[in-house]
């Protein structure tokens, strides 16, 4: 499965770079649906609130840590297989 997770990481990187190009969104949706049929979900926590109690991501904090932290960049997505996190997301977090 490790190779499959690497494919998901690459697909997620492409998706984040092509987010504004709507003609590609249909293909990404089809890929996600295929993974879901195999019991694998992946998501990007971009712009979500961050707290140190989150267990689904590993964060690198830039700037000063505050009580209002937000995920500003996703290096790797969170991958969940059959309800269990198999890859924690790697993210950059900034204080607001």
Region annotations inferred by a language model:
Residues 1-18, 26-96:
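Extended, amphipathic alpha-helical stalk segments that mediate dimerization
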């Amino acid at each position: 499965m490790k190779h499959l997770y690497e494919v998901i990481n690459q697909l997620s990187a492409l998706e984040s770079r092509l987010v504004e190009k709507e003609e590609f969104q249909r293909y990404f949706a089809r890929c996600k649906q295929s993974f879901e049929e195999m019991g694998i979900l992946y998501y990007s926590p971009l712009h979500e609130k961050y707290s140190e109690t989150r267990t689904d991501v590993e964060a690198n904090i830039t700037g000063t840590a505050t009580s209002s932290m937000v995920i500003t960049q996703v290096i790797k997505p969170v991958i969940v297989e059959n309800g269990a996190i198999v890859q924690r997301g790697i993210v950059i977090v900034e204080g607001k």
